A protein has these predicted regions:
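N-terminal exported-region signature
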Residues: 19-219
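Sec-dependent, cleavable N-terminal signal peptides
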Residues: 1-23
Length: 219
């Protein structure tokens, strides 16, 4: 999977010379992510705010015929299902979204490439429910999950939190748990490092919480 997140546009509002940095009132970061999706099950994230929306049917207008998408519902502990058949999406919820911070299982019958295009979320808040949920970083970064930004993703880890990362190649999960102030598990004591475009399971044993991020642009 190749990732290219670029500053493509800067919206400038100024009175006077538009090139003066002191006169920038707002900046929009627009980027793109080239995502190679393998055959079979994988956990996928879209880390850009797409226009006109982040519906699965918009993001994947014409995937391989037979492609399936499963989105986990943390409230009901069940999956919402969509499938692309004969040029159309059908299933439980045609309004299913895959926005920054969310995640799904995708199961195409053959590998394909797609490009996500949209705005980078300069400020984000991802809800992490009690129990199992599928989440992702709202920013397209591959960094240690619980380390503080800018060196890490700033996940609000708590004692007992579990993280499961699915491998398309092996069909198994990598497991790590935060216990008594340290990570233990398959990562050998290091925090999980999700890839750009990767979603993962979190098992939060405590109350619901928010994973907040602020990304600063400029000098």
């Amino acid at each position: 999977m190749r990732t290219k997140t670029l500053l493509l546009t800067a919206a400038l509002a100024a009175a006077g010379a538009a090139t003066s940095m002191a006169q920038v009132y707002s900046v929009n970061m627009v980027g793109y992510i080239n995502q190679n999706i393998p055959r079979g099950f994988s956990m996928l994230a879209n880390q850009l705010n797409n226009s006109p929306d982040n519906k699965v049917t918009t993001l994947f207008a014409a995937p391989p015929d037979g492609t399936q998408v499963y989105k986990f519902d943390a409230v009901t502990d069940t999956y919402v299902f969509l499938q692309y058949i004969d040029g159309n999406w059908e299933g439980d919820d045609l309004n299913m979204t895959l926005g920054p911070g969310e995640g799904v299982f995708i199961n195409p019958p053959s590998a394909f490439a797609t490009t996500f295009v949209g705005e980078v979320q300069l400020s984000s808040s991802v809800g992490v429910a009690n129990g199992f949920s599928i989440v992702s970083s709202a920013l397209p970064q591959s960094l240690p999950l619980s380390d503080a930004p800018p060196a890490g993703l700033g996940f609000p880890v708590a004692n007992g939190d579990q993280v499961y990362q699915f491998s398309n190649a092996t069909g198994t999960y990598t497991f790590n748990q935060f216990v008594d102030g340290a990570w233990e598990g398959d990562g050998g004591g290091s925090p999980p490092v999700p890839a750009v475009g990767e979603a993962f399971f979190v098992n939060n044993g405590g109350a619901s919480k928010n994973w907040n991020r602020t990304f600063t642009v400029g000098p």
